[in-house]
């Protein structure tokens, strides 16, 4: 083991050991441990002792500090702490530097809220300098509270040397990345249709619409089917003069900027006359849409409408036909108001004819650009109509919808109006409904490197594994160029200066402070607006000297900052060159699944473009934390418990275990509730604590001054050999799962092991501990507990620390080495056999429960039938004691028919969606059992996730074994057995009374037992020796009291 330092006043003796109690007070324990870590500087010591180990790189995704953490943050934080702890115990050097995300809309919106302003124009009025100063202050509002939360959840991070994206060094590295990519041709300026937030008056990136399920919300909009009369020579030639094309839209506000209609080239379109009275109109629409429009065209059915088709044409035949525009605003535009064709047209909805507004539709613009149709933007940055649209000038587009509908209806241009409920994108920050708008923006060219990004993706280990070729690969395959500019104020500036005179064009891009200072002659201490905007200089390419180089006003998307984190946190390439280039790819990264399309994606894009390599080697994508109402945990909904209140009542380690051991680490969702957290405590923390408490009490009682146990794997007792070998297998399994970043499976191994430790090893060894002379039992349990503390340090760091320090008197479990499987005996045959014995016993106890026979009631015999007896015979005494039977017989024989019963509540958290697969497989008999390893539908099951039940029992007193065979109990109870059962019930009653009086386990007692009649008295007298031995009774009086109900006991500490 590594050197932990002297056990002196600097460590354990300063630690406030609490008097052991049967149940842990987790908040109090955690308070003690945190205080010790702080004074002892244990985190710093853990780094110092590993500083010569291999550097293991972990990227800690920076949070925004303008709000307090919720359970989603906690989960990510727990994983960010657990994996580095594990790697540190494995000998790696794992620096953990905390960072803060400080730029972008979140900061600006918070500043606007504090300043009491709501519009972008108000920012311009007050001045960018004042606004950005408010933004700077707002982003650090909750830093101290975040540190408090992070420390309280036992996360070990370095705050002192942390970074902020607003730091000058960080921003300089971002400028370097921009210029490098610009020189490579990866960054370019373009004019495209993008998601646009009219409230924040800035474009967004397509990936920002896919990161969060809450971006898309149900919205009710007007759905209009509008008529477009066909005109011109080609319409006459095709016999369509006077026919009106029907186009469907859910955005009436885009109709004033309609420039074209688009059809699908190889789809059939039909001309149908209106069947309405006093109407002689003819309409053109997609043939497949006719059924849905039959009624509004005046037909009783789609069949009637189809029977009235006058003409059928392919879309490509009507391409080039002109139509009468809805409005006259752009009537004179060349190439406008023509039918175009393209395969993107969806004919399953609407009329199969798309109203194209190239200023507000990505595909609309692509098609219109190809045909030379102009793009006109008729709204301003705030989504209000410009003066060109005179009827609606100054009106917000959403307010204009109803007015436009009314005007078109008045003009007879609407065939059908309905309300349409659909999923609609909203801004991920301000939650306003987004629009699509043609804007000039700077782009990160991703489409050219998609294939390389897909190739590099194969080098990444994803958890869950399905992400690699599933969500992430699919997202990469359809990736679009990333809009990286924002028409905002608080962010890293785009480092591009342009000539203000197009007659003398020039563009300069800067990638360092030195380049800026050399050209502008000013020492820079801040790269934010407006300071950076003041940098101007004469255009070197203008011989007249009249034009000036001015910076483009936009700032970078905050996600560009985030994607630069791997190198910008180190101020690369200006510092730490060797350090970064030796570890360009992080060993580990973790965030929630939404970041597959966010930070993970952009890190991958940035690393591919800059370094032609992966940004990270291993990634965990955990699922979404839900509130107690099943919705995503939300501060506004207040649908989850107060985080700090849970810390102060249940404890952080309880929350940590609950989250880390759940299916959320496999990408599923998880509902957080206090009850579930409390239930989780009983899975691992309580059994661990109970085992240590048992060890402490019994080792203290073993001899005067107590027995000082030692780490030993030498015992030859069969139960000791079993639990030591089982511990070695536990180390092997937990290590394997941790190495593959499967923390949930590792946690389940620990949970299952402590159940075996408490319910089997300790219970079956209780007499040896009580005797006190068998030091092998104490050494074995000490060894197991010491190992459990080291394994559990990753999962419950504070409880493990407390138990470890009290157990070993060492400085800290977190300064110890990870257990070595080679330390432990490797008796797999013994383990397999003993596990069979355990299953025999659990089956027998389950049979008792089914038959209504208490475990304390002795029975005469148990008969065990198995396909192969093997070495089971030598375990008869253990089976007899566990099943409370006088004799055990074991024979080889045929097995009863068995059925597999899945336990969904147990299997569900691990298997998630696969649980239904295994249930169905079990029902149809598609399952196998090989040496106790059960597989259903090809999916392996854990021991506690199923039951094997008899399909046809030998008798009601038999129960099938999970590995084949059966247990049969002789349920005949004679008077002697019944008397012993009464005596054992009485012993149990006395033990409860001892606990209630808070007696030490070594305290002797005087006992008075009152019974209702002589028969019961005689029964107890027959087993008085048993009663006295089991309860440490030195004086026993059994009295008959007529009329009492049952047996009562009273006791006192014995005094000679």
Swiss-Prot record:
Residues 1-13 have a biased composition (Polar residues). Its cofactor is Zn(2+). Its main location: cytoplasm. One of its GO terms (molecular function) is aminoacyl-tRNA deacylase activity. InterPro entries: aa-tRNA-synth_Ia, Anticodon_Ile_ABEc, Ile-tRNA-ligase, Ile-tRNA-ligase_type2, M/V/L/I-tRNA-synth_anticd-bd, Rossmann-like_a/b/a_fold, tRNAsynth_Ia_anticodon-bd, Val/Leu/Ile-tRNA-synth_edit. It catalyses: tRNA(Ile) + L-isoleucine + ATP = L-isoleucyl-tRNA(Ile) + AMP + diphosphate. Signal peptide: none annotated. ATP binds at residue 635. Pfam families: Anticodon_1 (PF08264), DUF5915 (PF19302), tRNA-synt_1 (PF00133). Keywords: Aminoacyl-tRNA synthetase, ATP-binding, Cytoplasm, Ligase, Metal-binding, Nucleotide-binding, Protein biosynthesis, Zinc. Its EC number is 6.1.1.5. GO terms for cellular component: cytoplasm. It is an enzyme of class 6 (ligase). GO terms for biological process: isoleucyl-tRNA aminoacylation. A motif ('KMSKS' region) lies at residues 632-636. CDD domains: Anticodon_Ia_Ile_ABEc (cd07961). It is found in: Cytoplasm. Catalyzes the attachment of isoleucine to tRNA(Ile). As IleRS can inadvertently accommodate and process structurally similar amino acids such as valine, to avoid such errors it has two additional distinct tRNA(Ile)-dependent editing activities. One activity is designated as 'pretransfer' editing and involves the hydrolysis of activated Val-AMP. The other activity is designated 'posttransfer' editing and involves deacylation of mischarged Val-tRNA(Ile). Monomer. IleRS has two distinct active sites: one for aminoacylation and one for editing. The misactivated valine is translocated from the active site to the editing site, which sterically excludes the correctly activated isoleucine. The single editing site contains two valyl binding pockets, one specific for each substrate (Val-AMP or Val-tRNA(Ile)). This is Isoleucine--tRNA ligase. The lineage of its organism: Bacteria, Bacillati, Actinomycetota, Actinomycetes, Micrococcales.
């Amino acid at each position: 083991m590594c050197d932990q330092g002297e056990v002196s006043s600097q460590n354990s003796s300063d630690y406030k050991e609490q008097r052991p109690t049967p149940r842990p007070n987790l908040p109090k324990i955690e308070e003690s441990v945190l205080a010790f870590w702080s004074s002892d500087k244990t985190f710093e010591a853990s780094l110092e002792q590993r500083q010569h180990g291999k550097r293991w790189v972990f990227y800690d995704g920076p949070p925004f500090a303008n709000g307090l953490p919720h359970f989603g943050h906690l989960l990510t934080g727990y994983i960010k702490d657990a994996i580095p702890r594990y790697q540190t115990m494995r000998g790696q050097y794992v620096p953990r530097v905390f960072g803060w995300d400080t730029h972008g809309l979140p900061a600006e919106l918070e500043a606007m809220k504090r300043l009491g302003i709501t519009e972008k124009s108000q920012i311009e009025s007050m001045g960018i300098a004042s606004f950005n100063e408010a933004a700077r202050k707002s982003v650090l509002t909750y830093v101290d509270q975040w540190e408090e939360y992070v420390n309280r959840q036992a996360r070990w991070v370095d705050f002192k040397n942390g970074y902020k994206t607003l730091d000058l060094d960080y921003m300089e590295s971002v400028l370097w990345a921009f210029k490098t990519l610009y020189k490579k041709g990866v960054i370019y300026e373009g004019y495209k249709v993008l998601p646009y937030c009219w409230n924040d008056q800035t474009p967004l990136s397509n990936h920002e619409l896919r990161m969060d399920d809450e971006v898309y919300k149900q919205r009710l909009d007007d759905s209009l089917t509008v008529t477009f009369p066909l005109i011109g020579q080609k319409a006459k030639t095709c016999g369509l003069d006077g026919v009106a094309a029907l186009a469907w839209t859910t955005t009436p506000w885009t109709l004033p900027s309609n420039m074209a209609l688009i059809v699908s080239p190889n789809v059939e379109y039909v001309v149908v006359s209106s069947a309405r009275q006093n109407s002689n109109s003819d309409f053109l629409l997609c043939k497949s849409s006719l059924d849905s429009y039959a009624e509004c065209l005046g037909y009783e059915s789609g069949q009637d409408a189809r029977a009235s088709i006058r003409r059928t044409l392919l879309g490509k035949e009507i391409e080039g036909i002109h139509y009468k525009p809805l409005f006259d605003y752009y009537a004179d535009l060349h190439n406008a108001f023509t039918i175009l064709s393209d395969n993107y047209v969806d004919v399953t909805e609407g009329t199969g004819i798309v109203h194209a507004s190239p200023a507000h539709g990505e595909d609309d613009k692509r098609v219109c650009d190809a045909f030379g149709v102009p793009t006109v933007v008729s709204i301003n940055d705030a989504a209000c109509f410009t003066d060109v649209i005179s009827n609606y000038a100054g009106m917000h587009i959403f307010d204009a919808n109803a007015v436009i509908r009314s005007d078109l209806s008045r003009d007879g241009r609407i065939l059908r109006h309905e309300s349409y409920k659909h999923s609609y994108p909203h801004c991920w920050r301000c939650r306003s409904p987004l629009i699509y708008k043609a804007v000039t923006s700077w782009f990160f060219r991703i489409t050219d490197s998609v294939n390389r990004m897909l190739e590099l993706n194969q080098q990444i280990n994803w958890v869950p594994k399905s992400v690699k070729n599933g969500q992430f690969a699919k997202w990469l395959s359809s990736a679009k160029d990333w809009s990286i500019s924002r028409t905002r104020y608080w962010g890293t500036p785009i480092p591009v200066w342009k000539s203000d005179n197009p007659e003398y064009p020039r563009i300069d891009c800067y990638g360092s402070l030195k380049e800026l200072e050399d050209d502008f002659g000013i020492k820079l201490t801040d790269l934010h607006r407006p300071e950076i905007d003041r940098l101007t200089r004469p255009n070197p390419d203008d011989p007249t000297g009249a034009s000036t180089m001015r910076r483009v006003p936009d700032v970078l998307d905050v996600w560009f900052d985030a994607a630069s984190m791997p190198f910008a946190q180190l101020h690369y390439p200006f510092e730490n060159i060797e350090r970064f280039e030796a570890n360009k790819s992080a060993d580990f990264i973790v965030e929630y699944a939404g970041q597959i399309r966010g930070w993970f994606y952009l890190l991958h894009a940035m690393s591919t473009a800059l370094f032609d390599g992966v940004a990270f080697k291993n990634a965990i994508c955990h699922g979404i934390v839900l509130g107690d109402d099943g919705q995503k945990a939300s501060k506004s909904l207040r649908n989850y418990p107060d985080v700090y209140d849970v810390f102060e009542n249940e404890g952080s380690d309880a929350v940590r275990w609950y989250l880390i051991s759940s299916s959320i680490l496999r990408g599923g969702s998880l509902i957080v509730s206090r009850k579930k957290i409390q239930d989780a405590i009983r899975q691992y923390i309580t059994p661990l604590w109970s085992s240590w408490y048992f060890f402490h009490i019994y080792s203290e009682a073993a001899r005067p001054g107590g027995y000082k146990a030692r780490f030993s794997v030498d015992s030859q007792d069969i139960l000791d050999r079993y639990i030591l070998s089982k511990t070695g297998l536990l180390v092997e399994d937990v290590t394997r799962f941790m190495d593959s970043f499967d923390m949930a499976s590792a946690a389940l191994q620990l949970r299952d092991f402590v159940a075996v430790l408490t319910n089997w090893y300790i219970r079956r060894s209780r007499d040896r501990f009580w005797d006190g002379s068998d030091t092998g039992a104490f050494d074995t349990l000490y060894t197991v507990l010491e190992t459990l503390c080291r394994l559990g340090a990753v999962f419950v760091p504070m409880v493990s620390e407390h138990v470890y320090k009290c157990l070993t008197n060492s400085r800290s479990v977190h300064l110890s080495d990870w257990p070595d499987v080679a330390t432990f005996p490797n008796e797999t045959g013994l383990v397999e056999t003993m596990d069979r014995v355990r299953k025999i016993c659990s089956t027998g106890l389950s049979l008792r429960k089914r038959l209504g026979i208490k475990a304390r009631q002795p029975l005469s015999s148990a008969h065990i039938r198995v396909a192969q007896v093997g070495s089971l015979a030598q375990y008869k005494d253990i089976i007899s004691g566990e099943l409370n039977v006088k004799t055990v017989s074991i024979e080889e024989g045929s097995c009863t028919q068995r059925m597999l019963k899945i336990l969904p509540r147990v299997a569900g958290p691990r298997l998630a969606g696969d649980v239904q697969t295994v249930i169905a497989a079990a029902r149809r008999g598609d399952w196998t059992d090989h040496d106790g390893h059960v597989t259903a539908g090809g999916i392996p099951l854990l021991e506690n996730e199923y039951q094997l039940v008899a399909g046809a029992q030998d008798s009601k007193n038999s129960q099938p074994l999970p590995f084949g065979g059966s247990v049969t109990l002789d349920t005949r109870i004679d008077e002697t057995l019944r008397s012993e059962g009464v005596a054992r019930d009485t012993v149990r009653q006395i033990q409860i009374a001892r606990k209630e009086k808070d007696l030490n386990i070594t305290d002797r007692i005087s006992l008075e037992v009152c019974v209702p009649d002589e028969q019961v008295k005689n029964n107890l007298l027959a087993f008085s020796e048993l009663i006295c031995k089991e309860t440490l009774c030195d004086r026993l009086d059994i009295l008959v009291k007529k009329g009492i109900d049952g047996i009562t006991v009273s006791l006192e500490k014995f005094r000679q």
